Amino acid sequence: MKRKNFTEVSEFIFLGFSSFGKHQITLFVVFLTVYILTLVANIIIVTIICIDHHLHTPMYFFLSMLASSETVYTLVIVPRMLLSLIFHNQPISLAGCATQMFFFVILATNNCFLLTAMGYDRYVAICRPLRYTVIMSKGLCAQLVCGSFGIGLTMAVLHVTAMFNLPFCGTVVDHFFCDIYPVMKLSCIDTTINEIINYGVSSFVIFVPIGLIFISYVLVISSILQIASAEGRKKTFATCVSHLTVVIVHCGCASIAYLKPKSESSIEKDLVLSVTYTIITPLLNPVVYSLRNKEVKDALCRVVGRNIS
């Protein structure tokens, strides 16, 4: 069968929040504020964990890795979005779009599997406390972090290779960054294979972590219920609630965004979901999981007190 000739597309333009009209300046101020808070909070967490030896444990090692990943994650998406809110119709090259999607997929996948590693850490700490330091060795922690990044890299190569081998007819991306489905819609040809790849990858990235975390917490809850002291049960359970909150928000938004049927898709809902998992969730992590943590707050007080004195 003879291949059709397609006009070569060299750049895209984001439609973004153009439908919000006069509210775009308000959105810019809100998103900029959240962006700055996210960067500051995550940088504070990474810095405190690095310089305070009391926090040199597997749990806080994973926290620092998640905070670092979330920082880069926001840097990949938000600055370009803020630029588009002020200067409309700012183009992005095909290579720039591919690069943004590549790092977005790496970091989003990495975050999911880091949360899984943190769930395993909680399982070992609560269910196998006497062997915790032996099991959660530096070597295993490094392997879990490298494994998370490696899975993210593999998924990104799969996605970007499949996506940018497509011929594109349209140039206007009905979104605020190079997300998978909005870019796929611009293709001139049938994208069934790409949709199958996306569904398979998304299912793996979402359901494998959820499944492993679920198993971990079934075992954790059974151990918590065996604790004799009510105060002990409450304290142990509190350490798990923050992690579960982040997992539910992160994986919940991702599953709705990437696994919902086409018939249920709408531009407004997709924008709200995307804002949640690209802008709100990276701020939620440090607030819920770290800055409310007593050990982190104590470490912050020690660092501030040391600098003042």
Swiss-Prot record:
Tissue expression profile of the protein: Expressed in both the aorta, the coronary artery and umbilical vein endothelial cells (HUVECs) (at protein level).
Keyword Iron applies: no
Molecular functions per Gene Ontology: G protein-coupled receptor activity; olfactory receptor activity
Stretches that traverse the bilayer: 26-46, 55-75, 100-120, 140-160, 197-216, 237-257, 271-291
Extracellular side: 1-25, 76-99, 161-196, 258-270
Biological process terms in GO annotation: angiogenesis; chemotaxis; detection of chemical stimulus involved in sensory perception of smell; G protein-coupled receptor signaling pathway, coupled to cyclic nucleotide second messenger; lipid homeostasis; muscle organ development; regulation of angiogenesis; regulation of muscle cell differentiation
Function of the molecule: Olfactory receptor. Activated by the synthetic floral odorant, lyral, and by alpha-cedrene, a sesquiterpene constituent of cedarwood oil. Its activation increases intracellular Ca(2+). Acts as a key regulator of myogenesis through its actions on cell migration and adhesion by activating the Ca(2+)-dependent AKT signal transduction pathway. Also acts as a regulator of angiogenesis. Moreover, plays a role in the regulation of lipid accumulation in hepatocytes via the cAMP-PKA pathway. May be involved in sperm chemotaxis and motility.
Listed name of the protein: Olfactory receptor 10J5
